């Protein structure tokens, strides 16, 4: 019977299922976009693989995972409808990753590890620059994950190398310069 279909009685997932189907339909264009970005930023896929061991961490309710590659980042951005999946504005994140100024990670609910929840932009020492969910927003639900993110930062702090700390110091300076420029340009953050 059609009323027995999961999609009918699991309305909470309706939007997500729709987005997954759209992603499947767009897969070819996403792959082309990923190939284009990988050509332009040839180190990002390798950096993504390096991030796996250092930044991945899970607890009972939440987990932080590193993307496998540029395609995974683009897919995440498209599913959450935010700038990381965008051709134009998303490029700044690949530029930052290429320079090791900041990295993209995914915050997930542990019981739904494949479902996008929040996309994080972090500095090499684990400082969280941005937390974004659907439509480039941050909702009150992120407060529930704040304690987890603090514990995650403590765990990864023990995994960091001197090089990571040096990159983090440089990243902080670049972020401060960017804020000064945004203020000069009267951009509201």
Where are the language model's segments positioned?
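Catalytic-core elements of nucleic-acid end-processing and repair enzymes
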Residues: 1-189
């Amino acid at each position: 019977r059609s009323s027995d279909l999961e999609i009918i009685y699991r309305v909470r997932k309706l939007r997500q299922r729709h987005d997954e189907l759209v992603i499947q339909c767009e897969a070819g264009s996403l792959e082309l976009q990923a190939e284009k970005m990988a050509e332009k930023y040839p180190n990002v896929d390798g950096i993504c693989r390096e991030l796996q061991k250092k930044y991945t961490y899970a607890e009972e309710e939440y987990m932080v995972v590193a993307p496998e590659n540029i395609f995974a980042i683009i897919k995440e951005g498209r599913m959450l409808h935010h700038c990381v999946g965008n051709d134009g504005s998303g490029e700044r994140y690949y530029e930052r990753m290429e320079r090791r100024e900041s990295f993209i990670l995914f915050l997930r609910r542990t019981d739904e590890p494949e479902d996008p929840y929040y996309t994080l932009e972090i500095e090499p020492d684990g400082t969280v620059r941005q937390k974004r969910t659907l439509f480039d927003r941050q909702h009150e639900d992120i407060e529930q994950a704040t304690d987890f993110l603090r514990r995650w930062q403590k765990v990864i702090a023990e995994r960091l190398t001197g090089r990571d700390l040096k990159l983090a110091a440089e990243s902080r300076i670049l972020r401060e310069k960017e804020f000064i420029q945004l203020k000069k340009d009267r951009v509201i953050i």
